């Protein structure tokens, strides 16, 4: 058995909150994520009224394969940071997209380079889906230790 994930760029929740969410809501969300209100905070992440409107670009609720293809137009994203009620952490892009389809409450996927995806539940029809594009992502990412490593990676991802 060998390590198949080497040099994975690691992100964290605080950086993702700072990239995608409105200034007046960031501090509260970060506090809630670090307390026993975590589940409540994760639910509120998917309330799109707190996402910066200028970075939200509506897209159709694509099939898994097509969504992967669309996200890869912006970069060769292999591993992403996934935030949902059932799981939060690093995943391969394909697994993150598969998992996103299982989240009733919605999710956020951060691919890197200021590119993300989110969807939220919708009362009728397909969920509302958005491509998230942050132009000044380098200014925000530089304040965080986005180290390369395997911390937070599930065991099944580390072995052949």
Protein language model features and the residues they cover:
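Structured alpha/beta or helical-core interaction and ligand-binding surfaces enriched in interleaved
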Residues: 1-160
